């Protein structure tokens, strides 16, 4: 695996590069000449064109907003660009479908990409560098929320823009908490677990206290990060010291014991997220951790079910801890014309406008991705409403949230860890010690 990745990296070349010059008039003239030459190579859309966009925004509220957003762009852009969307399921499904399509030479021009997939596609030279368009249009990259640029840059190129990024939220049933004598959201994992046990005991085992689905780079990553400060993968993306420093062993043992004791829900084998939410809406689950990207959908469904919903910061060992996840939009440069790439950039630029960013957050719960959007009256007024406190929380905890390192190993390591977690927590086929041994074996192959 490692040899293939290195080979891919060696073949990666930059399409555009600038040499910083200064001082003499001669140097300045050369610099200006180079800039003009570079800008002349950046296409502007000349004729009406249709481009495709593959995404994971298939839930009710997500899809409704996406359609509204695309319809507005299609009607208002001055170039005659038509964007056609194709839902692919979840982000992992987008990655799988895109991999197949690229191999067949039939890929979309745009895709919403996961943190797992971005380094793979970037290292293979699949993603177009947006830098020339950014420079031509004076797009301010400093306006993009710094913490959300972790998967934007690759080898000095801008290969994505943050689009459906999110943190996690603790969604909890306020009435169940109140009935158990709990009048505030937990401030640490230890406190959350204490609450969960109390709710479980008070219901004679009828109501689980808390639940997590299996998402190694997201829900489990931040719990590990609260133990070891790096999560499930090292900061350089080249190893997993959590396997040797005791943090993974502690987490595997704890999670197994929580579910064994009954108060922590075991995620379903299929449609785990939907199943867990249904238990919550039916009053069978006191709290669960899910993405802020689902805040609007969860809020609406909880209200319809008569659930008094609370939304709070996520917690890890010893205090607050949160993950960063979600998707970033990339332009697929491989096998596409400069006209298609230019059209795709116009859509990306539209999505990054203040009003689009603000409404994307309001309508769905995904994070606002630009500082200027946070300063709009649209967002300020929305956050000022007490019932939207959870949305504001999602943005406030970004500064302390973490995501796995951008690494070409992330996708494969994520798959291996997910499989072992499933064997331990869902199938109950192995012990925590066996799970750790299996992970060490997988790591020795992946990070060889």
Per-region residue spans from a language model:
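Extracytoplasmic/periplasmic substrate-recognition and gating elements
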Residues: 75-76, 180, 260-264, 300-367
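Extracytoplasmic/periplasmic solute-binding protein
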Residues: 154-163, 168, 193-241, 256, ...
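Short, solvent-exposed loop/beta-turn-alpha elements that line the ligand-binding surface or hinge
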Residues: 43, 131-144, 208-210, 214, ...
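Long, aromatic- and glycine/proline-rich binding clefts that accommodate carbohydrate-like moieties
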Residues: 151, 309-312, 362-419, 423
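Hinge/lid segment of periplasmic solute-binding proteins
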Residues: 115-167, 204, 220-227, 247, ...
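Glycine-centered hinge/linker elements that transmit conformational signals in sensory
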Residues: 196-198, 238-269
């Amino acid at each position: 695996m490692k040899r293939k990745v290195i080979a891919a990296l060696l073949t990666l070349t930059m399409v555009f590069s600038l040499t910083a010059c200064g001082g003499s008039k001669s140097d300045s003239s050369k610099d200006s000449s180079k800039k003009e030459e570079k800008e002349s190579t950046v296409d502007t859309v000349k004729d009406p064109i249709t481009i495709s966009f593959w995404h994971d925004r298939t839930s009710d509220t997500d899809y409704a907003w996406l359609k509204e957003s695309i319809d507005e762009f299609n009607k208002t852009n001055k170039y005659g660009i038509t964007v056609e969307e194709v839902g692919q399921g979840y982000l992992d499904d987008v990655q799988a479908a895109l991999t197949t399509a690229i191999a067949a030479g039939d890929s979309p021009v745009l895709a919403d990409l996961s943190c797992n997939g971005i380094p793979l596609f970037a290292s293979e030279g699949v993603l177009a560098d947006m830098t020339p368009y950014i420079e031509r249009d004076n797009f301010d990259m400093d306006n993009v929320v710094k913490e959300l640029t972790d998967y934007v840059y690759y080898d000095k190129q801008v290969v994505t823009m943050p689009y459906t990024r999110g943190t996690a939220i603790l969604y909890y049933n306020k009435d169940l908490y109140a009935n158990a004598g709990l009048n505030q959201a937990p401030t640490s994992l230890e406190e959350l677990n204490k609450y969960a046990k109390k709710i479980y005991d008070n219901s004679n085992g009828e109501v689980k206290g808390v639940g997590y689905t299996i998402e190694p780079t997201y829900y489990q990553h931040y719990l590990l990060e609260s133990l070891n400060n790096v999560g499930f993968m090292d900061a350089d993306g080249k190893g997993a010291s959590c396997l040797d420093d005791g943090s993974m062993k502690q987490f595997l043992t704890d999670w197994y014991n929580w579910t064994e004791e009954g108060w922590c829900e075991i995620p379903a084998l299929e449609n785990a997220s939907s199943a867990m939410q249904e238990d919550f809406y039916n009053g069978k689950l006191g709290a669960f951790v899910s993405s802020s990207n689902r805040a609007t959908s969860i809020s609406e469904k909880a209200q319809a079910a008569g659930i008094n919903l609370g939304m709070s910061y996520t917690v890890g060992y010893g205090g607050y801890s949160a993950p960063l996840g979600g998707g970033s939009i990339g332009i697929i440069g491989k096998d596409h014309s400069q006209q298609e790439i230019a059209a795709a950039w116009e859509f990306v630029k539209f999505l990054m406008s203040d009003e689009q960013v603000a409404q994307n957050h309001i309508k769905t719960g995904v994070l606002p991705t630009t500082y200027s959007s946070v300063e709009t009256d649209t967002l300020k007024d929305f956050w000022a409403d007490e019932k939207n406190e959870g949305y504001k929380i999602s943005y406030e905890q970004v500064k302390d949230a973490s995501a796995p390192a951008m690494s070409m190993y992330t996708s494969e390591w994520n798959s291996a860890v997910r499989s072992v977690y499933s064997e331990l927590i869902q199938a109950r086929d192995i012990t925590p010690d066996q799970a750790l041994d299996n992970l060490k074996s997988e790591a020795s192959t992946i990070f060889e």
